[in-house]
A protein has these predicted regions:
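C-terminal segment of classical bacterial N-terminal signal peptides
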Residues: 11-24
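Ser/Thr-glycine-rich phosphate-binding loops at phosphate-binding pockets of nucleotides
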Residues: 264, 268-269
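The Walker A (P-loop) glycine that initiates the GxxxxGKT/S ATP-binding motif of P-loop NTPases
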Residues: 260-262
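Cys-dependent protein tyrosine phosphatase-like superfamily
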Residues: 23-258, 272-365
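Bacterial N-terminal signal peptides that target proteins for export
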Residues: 1-8, 12
């Protein structure tokens, strides 16, 4: 397999004689085998985008390639760009992009194999403290979860004009609200322009003893209360119905991105994201790392809660690996396997699971 067709950089054209528009030849050698099962071409092992005072830092580590060119996705490159934004199989470049409110996406193109498109994950603001892209993670098979397709957040309530404008620019077409009716009434969502609204109430059945944790909190057992709620998010009837609706909505055809959220964007949303990433093949350690990011994004809320209510309530404001352990343990206890949970617990058939993978994965080889 020759890599000419796979090694195009956004905005560069290729003539019939196999040359870039500026006359440089495309690599025509065979793509090297990059793993033990015969897959060809480059594979990105790690890649990340971070916004700093100097610009966007794009870093990567790849195998099966000798050079990676970084470009702004969807923009024709200047000669200066072509000369400066590239590196070896492992590299790091600083791109001084002034995005003027627009969220820049970067295309990482190896000299052999498919390109990878990434953006910065953190798009939070003061009121949308836990707003982030759910994509940008590598699967165990070497594919990557698409960015710009799924967002997770805290409640879309009490937003500033700037917050609303930022949401509008994300291209969100559907918002899925995992909150209880009382939460939705007190703090209704401010929807992005043109977005549809879907309710998937995880704790809809307040009479379910699994979600009745008031006595635990009253007795100072806040940690145990959250552990119990995480188990309920797996096995209670209302939760299974809500998460089934979440994933059926995600799998449905349609253009535009989807955003799902609860109140803080950490527990109900955290489990939804953990299920999605696991379904897509993201390694468990990465799933946990993503889950725990809520502590970093919500640092100010956690500190404010400790100051106002006392440190005893910190377990209610934070996420803990043990909370996610409780949910995955409940999957094993009730359903035996994660696949059984998807199919028996949530009613996702092979077609829906395949649709989710097709829609939200970009090939890594």
């Amino acid at each position: 397999m020759r890599c000419a067709a796979a090694c195009l950089v956004a905005g560069w054209t290729v003539s019939a004689n196999g040359l870039f528009s500026d006359g440089r030849a495309i690599a025509a050698e065979m793509c090297p085998v990059t793993d033990g099962i015969g897959r060809l071409g480059a594979s990105f092992v790690t890649a990340d985008v971070q916004h700093t005072a100097k610009g966007y830092v794009v870093s990567w580590q790849a195998i099966g390639t000798t050079q990676v060119v970084v470009s702004l996705a969807g923009r024709t490159l200047t000669e200066r760009d072509k000369a400066g934004w590239h590196g070896a199989a492992s590299g790091r470049v600083v791109i001084p992009v002034r995005h003027a409110g627009q969220r820049p996406f970067f295309r990482l193109t190896p000299d052999c194999g498919p390109a990878l498109v990434l953006a910065e994950r953190d798009i939070s603001s003061r009121r949308l403290s836990n707003l982030r892209d759910a994509g940008g993670y590598r699967t165990a098979a070497g594919d990557w979860v698409r960015m710009g397709a799924i967002y997770r957040s805290n409640a879309l309530a009490g937003l500033t004009r700037a917050d609303r404008q930022a949401l509008d620019r994300l291209g969100i077409r559907t918002v899925i609200d995992l909150r209880h009716v009382q939460e939705r009434t007190v703090a209704p969502d401010v929807l992005p322009g043109g977005a549809g609204y879907v309710v998937a109430d995880v704790f809809a059945d307040a009479s379910d003893p699994q979600v009745d944790v008031g006595s635990l909190i009253a007795s100072g057992r806040e940690y145990d209360a959250i552990v119990q709620l995480n188990r309920a998010m797996v096995s209670s009837a209302a939760a299974r119905q809500a998460y089934a609706r979440l994933f059926h909505t995600l799998a449905a055809d349609g253009d535009g991105a989807v955003l799902f959220h609860c109140t803080a964007g950490k527990d109900r949303t955290g489990w939804g994201a953990a299920v999605l990433l696991t379904l897509l093949g993201v390694p468990r350690e990465t799933v946990y790392a993503d889950y725990l990011l809520s502590n970093r994004y919500r640092e100010h809320e956690i500190e404010a809660g400790a100051h106002g209510q006392g440190t005893a309530f910190v377990p209610l404001e934070r996420v803990d690996a043990a909370y996610l352990d409780a949910a995955f343990d409940e999957v094993t206890r009730v359903f035996g396997t994660f696949d059984n949970y998807l199919k028996q617990g949530l009613g996702l058939d092979d077609r829906v699971i395949s649709d989710l993978k097709t829609k939200f994965l970009q090939p890594g080889q």
